Amino acid sequence: MLFRSVGALLCFADCMPVIIVLPTGRFAVVHAGWRGIENEISAKALDLMLDQECQEHDFSRSELAAQTNVYIGPYIHRECFETGADVHALFVTKFGKECRFNETHIDLGAALRVQLIARGIDPARICDLGCCTVCENDRFFSFRAQDGVSGRHGAFAIRL
């Protein structure tokens, strides 16, 4: 069911806020930490929305995907996202070398882009704010940079 004039609020610190907007106005607001990205939560939300739109209307899935916009807010970037060897190997194996920053750090944004592009999202329609919550801790809350005691940001989307 598609509601009119509905809003969604997402609270986050270092995790990735992802807002997916189909050309029809249907949207999803997704909280994606490393486990969510590994389990492709944003891509699954996109799949669900595309499937629903194609069932309800006579749309081509590939055309809808190609016109979908994805907005990514501030999150912990590759320079600051140190992982254990197990998580590092999992991401490189699953999403390719694009998400490998170095021997101990992975690029969550690259892993997400791999998933979205594989589903037909035009790379030019993926808008990443480009801000790291850890590097820019004077502007953003960071669970890691603030030793587990931090505030939260809000990502808000509304369909009018």
Set out the residue ranges of the language-model regions.
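Active-site microenvironment for binding and transforming phosphate-containing groups
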Residues: 1-160
